Regions:
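Terminal, non-catalytic domain-edge segments
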Residues: 72-83, 88-91, 96-205
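Eukaryote-skewed repeat-based solenoidal scaffolds used as protein-protein interaction platforms
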Residues: 1-105
């Protein structure tokens, strides 16, 4: 989940990017659909980050009030209880919702399959939601072995170095689709180069 990575980085430029380009990254008009909830859930996360309280609460209640939720989505109930409390600026409600996700059994179930490199020792949902709360000025006082305070507190680096040259040309003010198209183009170029290298290998092997 790249939302998690960006939020935990405390990189304000990237966080602002998610907020500014929210409507390009997710479709906030996507309705709740039991058979495919991922787009609905992703949109809710960015609504929470951008502070669109009324719409966030309406959508969260739509999910919570559905008596026929998919069994696989029952683990997302605390997430949406958190959203309602966040929209209401209810610190106790936020704490109670995230406390449920810190209970070992539910913590494991909620984290499973979300973050391959972290979900076996961190609770990603709690970290992400507590970070969103912190961004909006709410200290929930959470400090757990699977959701340590050090990762929730906002502590940006003095400098964020860009590790790859191809990323240095990206304009964070450009539409999100520009970046998507750029990455697709690079992937196609890499694929074509691989095909050409393969042809060159066989040509050299058989003298053609």
């Amino acid at each position: 989940n790249f939302f998690f990575m960006i939020l935990l980085s405390d990189n304000q430029k990237l966080i602002d990017y998610l907020i500014k380009h929210r409507d390009e990254i997710v479709d906030i008009s996507v309705p709740y659909k039991r058979t495919d909830t991922r787009p609905f859930f992703n949109a809710n996360t960015l609504l929470a980050l951008s502070g669109d309280w009324q719409l966030l609460k309406e959508r969260a209640l739509t999910f919570l009030n559905d008596e026929k939720k998919a069994r696989s989505d029952l683990k997302r109930i605390p997430d949406h209880e958190f959203y309602v409390a966040l929209a209401d600026k209810n610190i106790k409600g936020m704490q109670e919702a995230l406390d449920k996700l810190l209970e070992l059994k539910l913590a494991k179930r909620a984290a499973k399959g979300t973050l391959l490199h972290f979900d076996f020792y961190l609770q990603p949902q709690v970290l992400m939601y507590a970070k969103i709360a912190a961004i909006h000025g709410f200290d929930l006082g959470i400090d757990s072995p699977i959701a340590p305070k050090e990762l929730i507190d906002i502590n940006p680096l003095v400098e964020y170095k860009i590790p790859y040259d191809f990323m240095k040309s990206f304009d964070f003010d450009a539409p999100h689709q520009v970046w998507v198209n750029y990455v697709k183009q690079r992937m196609e170029e890499a694929k074509q180069k691989k095909v050409e290298n393969k042809k060159g290998f066989w040509a050299s092997l058989f003298g053609r």
